[in-house]
């Protein structure tokens, strides 16, 4: 990411990867209930049993889940979520600057090099982290009160059952929509954040510090949610589906369109934005500060020796 103060030491690749992983895990822990609410809203419409609860809005979904299934249910799938951030966010965010430098031919990084870096790191991270995404979504989606009997008792039980009943390919189910979603998210999120931060710093509107990171993260979160929401909903439905429910990703999208209309593609938009916006703020602020502090500590240790 652009901008280092004169006294700052540019962070190493290892520092960036570590900082991205830690910052993403912190953000996930804080915002996970919003993500669970988003998943429940996105799959609403699939379960047509009379006993199924109807979720209304973000707060209503969170309250309903807490009352009917217990507050702990809001964090169902968190271990898989943290595994996902360690394997996924650490790479897509931590490697972004390094890959961007690879695509940069001139003195300054162009928009094309930023987009290429976002495409590359996002794509690589999806293939590595997809099994954690499948398990996370399925644990968040299953209810103990209505619909089909819960398929999994926990994170590692889910990995085992999916691998034994659906094969290893089951752990990579939904890779295509998730790849599309995360290419959009990675490019929009990182490129928008990078451009916004660069504009604020270069025009001397804000210094390269917490307020600048906060504003840049909010703008990046909104733009990302608008562009990624339709793909995100299809991805969630397809990943959570039972074997044979949908024949393909396009079939899933078409069934959503014919049964529920175009608005189905924006189900859970508000929790998506609240989650992604707040996640971006926490992650980027922690990421930037952690990078800076780690390099200061390293510099102090080098001076001491």
UniProtKB/Swiss-Prot annotation:
Catalytic activity as recorded in UniProt: H(+)(in) = H(+)(out)
Activity regulation comment: Has no constitutive proton transporter activity and has to be activated by long-chain fatty acids/LCFAs. Inhibited by purine nucleotides. Both purine nucleotides and LCFAs bind the cytosolic side of the transporter and directly compete to activate or inhibit it. Activated by noradrenaline and reactive oxygen species. Despite lacking canonical translational encoding for selenocysteine, a small pool of the protein has been observed to selectively incorporate selenocysteine at 'Cys-252'.
Transmembrane segments: 11-32, 74-96, 115-131, 177-193, 211-230, 265-287
GO MF entries: cardiolipin binding; GDP binding; long-chain fatty acid binding; oxidative phosphorylation uncoupler activity; proton transmembrane transporter activity; transmembrane transporter activity
GO cellular component terms listed in the entry, alphabetical order: mitochondrial inner membrane
Location in the cell: Mitochondrion inner membrane
Keywords on record: Ion channel, Ion transport, Membrane, Mitochondrion, Mitochondrion inner membrane, Oxidation, Repeat, Transmembrane, Transmembrane helix, Transport
InterPro entries listed in its UniProt record: Mit_carrier, Mito_Metabolite_Transporter, Mitochondrial_sb/sol_carrier, Mt_carrier_dom_sf
Positions on the Mitochondrial intermembrane side per record topology: 1-10, 97-114, 194-210, 288-305
Record's function text: Mitochondrial protein responsible for thermogenic respiration, a specialized capacity of brown adipose tissue and beige fat that participates in non-shivering adaptive thermogenesis to temperature and diet variations and more generally to the regulation of energy balance. Functions as a long-chain fatty acid/LCFA and proton symporter, simultaneously transporting one LCFA and one proton through the inner mitochondrial membrane. However, LCFAs remaining associated with the transporter via their hydrophobic tails, it results in an apparent transport of protons activated by LCFAs.
Subunit composition and interactions: Most probably functions as a monomer. Binds one purine nucleotide per monomer. However, has also been suggested to function as a homodimer or a homotetramer. Tightly associates with cardiolipin in the mitochondrion inner membrane; may stabilize and regulate its activity.
Name under which the protein is recorded: Mitochondrial brown fat uncoupling protein 1
């Amino acid at each position: 990411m652009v901008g280092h103060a004169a006294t700052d030491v540019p962070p190493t690749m290892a520092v960036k990867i570590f900082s991205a992983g830690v910052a993403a895990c912190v953000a996930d822990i804080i915002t996970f209930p919003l993500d669970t609410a988003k998943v429940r809203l996105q799959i609403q419409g699939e379960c047509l049993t009379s006993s199924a609860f109807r979720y209304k809005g973000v707060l209503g979904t969170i309250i309903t889940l807490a009352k009917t299934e217990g507050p702990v249910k809001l964090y169902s799938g968190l271990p898989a979520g943290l595994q996902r951030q360690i394997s996924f966010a650490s790479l897509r965010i931590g490697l972004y600057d390094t890959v961007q430098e690879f695509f940069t031919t001139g003195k300054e990084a162009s928009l094309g090099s930023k987009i290429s870096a976002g495409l590359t790191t996002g794509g690589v991270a999806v293939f590595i982290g997809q099994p954690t995404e499948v398990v996370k979504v399925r644990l968040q989606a299953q209810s103990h009160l209505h619909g089909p009997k819960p398929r999994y008792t926990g994170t590692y039980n889910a990995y085992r059952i999916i691998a034994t009943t659906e094969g290893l390919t089951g752990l990579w189910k939904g890779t295509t929509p998730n790849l599309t979603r995360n290419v959009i998210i990675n490019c929009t999120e990182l490129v928008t954040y990078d451009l916004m931060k660069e504009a604020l710093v270069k025009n001397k509107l804000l210094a390269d510090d917490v307020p600048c990171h906060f504003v840049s993260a909010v703008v990046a979160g909104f733009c990302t949610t608008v562009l990624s929401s339709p793909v995100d909903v299809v991805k969630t439905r397809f990943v959570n589906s039972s074997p044979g429910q949908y024949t393909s990703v396009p079939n899933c999208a078409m069934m959503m369109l014919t049964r529920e209309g175009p608005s189905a593609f924006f189900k859970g938009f508000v929790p998506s934005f609240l989650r992604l916006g707040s996640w971006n703020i926490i992650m980027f602020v922690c990421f930037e500060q952690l990078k800076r502090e780690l390099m200061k500590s390293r510099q102090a240790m080098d001076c001491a020796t």
